[in-house]
Every structure is written in C-alpha cells, then in structure tokens.
Curated annotation (Swiss-Prot):
Effect of gene knockout: Slight reduction of rosette leaf size and reduction by 50 percents in fresh weight and seed production. The double mutant plants mmdh1 and mmdh2 have decreased germination rate, grow slowly, are small, have increased photorespiration and die before producing seeds.
Annotated compartments: Mitochondrion matrix
Subunit structure: Homodimer.
Pfam families to which the protein is assigned, alphabetical: Ldh_1_C, Ldh_1_N
Protein source organism: Arabidopsis thaliana
GO cellular component, one term: chloroplast
Residues at which substrate binds: 109, 115, 147, 181
BP GO annotations: malate metabolic process; response to cold; tricarboxylic acid cycle
Active site: 205 (proton acceptor)
Coiled coil: none
Protein name: Malate dehydrogenase 1, mitochondrial
Family: Belongs to the LDH/MDH superfamily. MDH type 1 family.
Length: 341
C-alpha cells in the first residue's frame, strides 16, 4: 500500500516533502511495461509506477505522445529508468524483457456509450497487443485494465492459447478499483478509518457482476440490510458515478491508476517472493462453473499461487452471486468468440 510521510526541516524555512513508497526490502531488477501510457489512465499510472522502488525499468508505450510522457516522468529522481516507445514498430522493444505488462490501452467509457460500443473498439486493441506480448515477453505477468475486463481477459487467454504461450497463472483482470471503492464507501457508513478496512469483491468488473462481500468486511460493523444493499449498488455503479460527474469529459482515470498501481505492486511483491500477498483479481478459476471469476488470490513467484475459496456468504450475497452469473457468462463467451473469429 502507499505510505505518505511528511518530512519537515527545522534548520531552514518550513518545507514539506511528500515521499510516497510502496514496498521495501530486496529489490531485484524488474521491468514493467505500460501499454497505453499516454492515455488518461496511463499517465498517472506511469507516475505511480515511477514512484515504486521495486521497478528498475519502466517502459512506456502508446501510439502517440509517449516520448513526452517518458521525458516528464523520467525526470523524477527515483530508481527506475524510463524509456518511451511510440507506434507499432517499437512495440517489440517496449515489451522485450518485461516481467510485468500493464494494459490500460483503449478508449474510455463516455456518457451514453454501451458496453458493445466499448467492446467493439477495445477488443481489437487488446487482441493486437496480446499477440505481441505472446511473441516478445510470453512469460510476463499481464495486468488487464482495458474494459470490458469481463471480455478482454478471455480474449487475451485465447490469443495466448493460439500462440502456445498461455499460462493461466499469469493473466489477471484488474478489479482492484472495485475493492478500493467498496472499502471507501463501507468506511464512510461504518464510521471506521478507511485504512483499516478490507472488503473482498468477487464476480466480474462491470455493473451487477461486481459483488462486494460486505458480510466479510473488516472491521465488522452492524449495518442494516438497506445500507448494505445501497453500498453494493454504489460499488457496482461507481464507474458510472464518475463518468456522470465528469459530464462527458472523462471516466475514472485517477482512481483506476491508483488501483492499478496497487495491484501491480502486489504482483511485484509476489514475484520477489514476499509471502502471503493476497488480492482480489479476475482470473481463470474453478471455484464456480464459470471459466473466469474474480475472487481473492494468493500471489507468488509464478503469478497466481492459489485461488482462495469464496468463504461464507450472506443470503443477499448468495442471491447476488447467482444473479451475476448469466451476464458474466455472456461476456466471457463474447470475448472467446471475438478472439476466434
């Protein structure tokens, strides 16, 4: 997690320096590539990954404007070296040797845009990028941010299968923003410090497929069923809330970048052998009848070390689980069909 530390100098005029760090300890060489680094999510994500001391090489790729982002971020005096790559001809260089690839590429959601609209654009982008990943860094961990994640992760899996390079332990749909929102909203209603809150979120990463398990939230609070229902609904509609608040001028870019950086840090910790790194993610799974499902996973040197059981669910959550399955199943099938057409 991020930690902010305010350092004040008493010898000179009062000055404050905010130092942000993620993890400490052993720091092996790790290359992280961000595909879509010049976009609304990509730029703040690049900044946050530049602040992560676990990253030794930060590779920024996009179809345009990447050199400027790389130059800007590259002036920050942290460990990683930054290189920007632009255009199809440089994608291979951006990917070669990557330990972790984060994909926020694609168009953001706008008011009035349907999921089909989003799918029709972003599915093709993801397909092309994953084809390159399979060729140039087939053993990297993949963090999929590009929406609709419920479909783009199955697309990626199919592309890797075709290339003979699929490792289900290394493909992740980033659902961390759902967890971040659930924690924030729960803390507000439970009147507890948000830093102490944890809420597992299962299912998928869109609308009703997002199912926060407030019955498993810590610390526990005695909230009414009406409040829990409202919290669930707000978590599911969090993306729409931001899109509407920005009035057509963007989607959840900053909070998504923060969530993406949190999950990437967890993946790097796992790669480096830190024990008991557990996060929620949308992965290949057998805990339900669906081939992909978001739940708590234990991260390690090979990516997913273990997909954890769902644990006890309330009656409301059991109903939500059954209700989300048809839509999630349809989204998965849509992705598989696209990848194979």
């Amino acid at each position: 997690m991020f930690r902010s530390m305010l350092v004040r100098s008493s010898a000179s005029a009062k000055q404050a320096v905010i130092r942000r760090s993620f993890s400490s300890g052993s720091v092996p060489e790790r290359k992280v590539a961000i595909l879509g680094a010049a976009g609304g999510i990509g730029q703040p994500l690049a900044l946050l990954m530049k602040l992560n001391p676990l990253v030794s090489s930060l590779s920024l790729y996009d179809i345009a404007n990447t050199p400027g982002v790389a130059a800007d971020v590259g002036h920050i005096n942290t460990r990683s070296e930054v290189v920007g790559y632009m255009g199809d001809d440089n994608l291979a260089k951006a990917l070669e040797g990557a330990d972790l690839v984060i994909i926020p590429a694609g168009v953001p959601r706008k008011p009035g845009m349907t999921r089909d609209d989003l799918f029709n654009i972003n599915a093709g982008i993801v397909k092309n990028l994953c084809t390159a990943i399979a060729k140039y860094c087939p053993h990297a961990l993949i963090n999929m941010i590009s929406n609709p994640v419920n479909s783009t992760v199955p697309i990626a899996a199919e592309i890797f299968k075709k290339a003979g390079m699929y490792d289900e332990k290394k493909l992740f749909g980033v659902t961390t923003l759902d967890v971040v929102r659930a924690r924030t909203f729960y803390a507000g209603k439970a009147n507890v410090p948000v830093a102490e809150v944890n809420v597992p979120v299962i299912g998928g990463h869109a609308g009703v497929t997002i199912l926060p398990l407030f019955s498993q939230a810590t610390p526990q609070a005695n909230l009414s069923s009406d409040i829990l229902t409202a919290l669930t609904k707000r978590t599911q509609d969090g993306g729409t809330e931001v899109v509407e608040a920005k009035a057509g001028k963007g989607s959840a870019t900053l909070s998504m970048a923060y969530a993406g950086a949190l999950f990437a840090d967890a993946c790097l910790k796992g790669l480096n052998g830190v024990p008991d790194v557990i996060e929620c993610s949308y992965v290949q799974s057998t805990i339900t009848e669906l081939p992909f499902f978001a739940s708590k996973v234990r991260l390690g040197k090979n990516g997913v070390e273990e997909v954890l059981d769902l644990g006890p669910l309330s009656d409301f959550e059991k109903e939500g689980l059954e209700a989300l399955k048809p839509e999630l199943k349809s989204s998965i099938e849509k992705g598989v069909k696209f990848a194979n057409q």
